[in-house]
Amino acid sequence: MRPRAVFLMGPTATGKTALACALAERFPVELVSVDSALVYRGLDIGAAKPDAATLRRHPHALVDIRDPAEPYSAAMFREDALAAMQSISARGRVPLLVGGTGLYFRALERGLAAMPAADPELRERLRAQAERDGWPALHARLAHLDPEAAARIRPNDAQRVQRALEAIELSGRRLSELHAGRALPERLPYRVRKLALLPDRGILRERIAARFDAMLAAGFLDEVRRLRERGDLTADLPAMRAVGYRQAWQHLEGAFDAGEFRARAIHATRQLAKRQTTWLRSGLDARVFDPFRPGCLGALSDAIALFLGPATA
C-alpha cells in the first residue's frame, strides 16, 4: 500500500503557512514547502517566509536550500521533495506539502518527461513578461541560460523562444541535454489528498495590498538592497525575478518612484494570485475551502482525519 501525503494548495496571501502549522499541531504530519521563492536564502520578507520561531516549532523542508545565485527547477524540486517525503514516511509520519507553486505540484504529482508538456501557468507568465519587456528580452535570457539554443532561434520567434524557456524552467536542463534522452515521466508513489484554498477574490486583493504594505514596513527594500550589494546577483536570475523582488530591483535602479513601485508590486502579486487561482480551478481533484471563513481549520481537519483514518487523528 502506498503511503499517504496531503497537498495544501492556494494562491499567495491566503494564510497557507498558518493553517499548515495549525494542522501540524493536530496530526502526525511534517511540512514540505512548495514555493519557488522560499527555496532561496535571503528572500525572507518579500517571499513571506515563515519567521525563525515558526520554523523552529514547525520545520519546513525545502526552505533556504539554495543561494539566490543558483538555479532551481521543477525537476530539482521533484527530486528534493521526493527525498523529503520518503524521509518523513520512514519516520511513520505524513508529508503535508504546502504552497502555491502549481508548476512544482504538477511536476511532483505527474513527473517530468525529458521534454515536458506545455504548462499553461508558466506559458501565461512568459507571455506576460514578453508583453511587458518584448520577445528579444526573453531571447536574451535564453542566450544566458542556453547559448546553443539561442543561436538557433531568432529573437522575435516567439513560439520557439517561449518553448525553449518553458523546457529549461520545467526540467532544469538545456535543450541539447533534453534532446539526448527522453525518459518517461514517473508518477508520484503516494496516495494524495488535495486541499485547495480559494477565497473571495475581492478579499484576497485587499489582503495582498495590506500584506505588501506590511512587508515595506518590515524592511523589504532594505532586504533587496542587501541582495544587490552582494555584487554577484543580476536582475535576470530566477530568484530576482520573483514577484516583488523584480519590482524592488527596478525601483532601486531608478526605473520608477516609490509610489509606482508599490503599485506595480501589488499589481504583479494580484496577477500571480489570479494565475494560481486559475490553475487550482482547472480540473484538479481537490476539495475546496475558503480560508477566510470561520471554521476553515476545523473543516480542513475533518478532511485530513477522514483521509488518514482514526488511528492518526
Segments and roles (model prediction):
Residues 1-313:
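Phosphate/pyrophosphate-binding catalytic cores of soluble transferases and nucleic-acid-acting enzymes
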